Amino acid sequence: MAKLHDYYKDEVVKKLMTEFNYNSVMQVPRVEKITLNMGVGEAIADKKLLDNAAADLAAFSRQKPLSTKARKFVACFKIRQGYPIGCKVTLRGERMWEFFERLITIAVPRIRDFRGLSAKSFDGRGNYSMGVREQIIFPEIDYDKVDRVRGLDITITTTAKSDEEGRALLAAFDFPFRK
């Protein structure tokens, strides 16, 4: 079991129960899933780029990515409906906790010119979204084998009812918010 999951059950739940005066342990917000999305717009011209992006995503998520397809026809981007234009992974359970731990402790501190993550990236329902400009912040990616530096979107979905609860949940994990 991931250390962060044990830390959540032992420490974070108690802290949030006293902070928000919850009556039951089930009211305490928890991390439900983490979604990683990598859009590869250049995949229209070269399908190999999508395969390389999927391989990178599989390397640091430790799960096979799902190919995402275009929903609409967009003439100026030369995209037709159904074209594969990206890949995504939804992490839950043990893999989610392992990835979350690696994200906080290893990957985020390796971001170039890192000064903390914005605390304003909540969606109004306690879910947090962030963008990463380079996939090479993850140690599983071999820098010499990278054909192109790509970014990705990371969405942390929680059961929190408000942004305040979501922020308190992530802050309890020592999430590196900007001060």
UniProtKB/Swiss-Prot annotation:
Recorded GO CC terms: ribonucleoprotein complex; ribosome
UniProt-listed NCBIfam families: PRK00010.1
Gene Ontology molecular-function annotations: rRNA binding; structural constituent of ribosome; tRNA binding
The name this protein goes by in its record: Large ribosomal subunit protein uL5
Superkingdom as given in the UniProt entry: Bacteria
InterPro entries, per database record: Ribosomal_uL5 (IPR002132), Ribosomal_uL5_bac-type (IPR020930), Ribosomal_uL5_C (IPR031309), Ribosomal_uL5_dom_sf (IPR022803), Ribosomal_uL5_N (IPR031310)
Lineage: Bacteria, Pseudomonadati, Pseudomonadota, Gammaproteobacteria, Enterobacterales
An annotated GO BP: translation
Family note: Belongs to the universal ribosomal protein uL5 family.
Role according to the record: This is one of the proteins that bind and probably mediate the attachment of the 5S RNA into the large ribosomal subunit, where it forms part of the central protuberance. In the 70S ribosome it contacts protein S13 of the 30S subunit (bridge B1b), connecting the 2 subunits; this bridge is implicated in subunit movement. Contacts the P site tRNA; the 5S rRNA and some of its associated proteins might help stabilize positioning of ribosome-bound tRNAs.
Keywords noted in UniProt: Acetylation, Ribonucleoprotein, Ribosomal protein, RNA-binding, rRNA-binding, tRNA-binding
Location of N6-acetyllysine modifications: 3
Subunit composition and interactions: Part of the 50S ribosomal subunit; part of the 5S rRNA/L5/L18/L25 subcomplex. Contacts the 5S rRNA and the P site tRNA. Forms a bridge to the 30S subunit in the 70S ribosome.
Classification via Gene3D superfamilies: 3.30.1440.10
Listed Pfam families: Ribosomal_L5, Ribosomal_L5_C
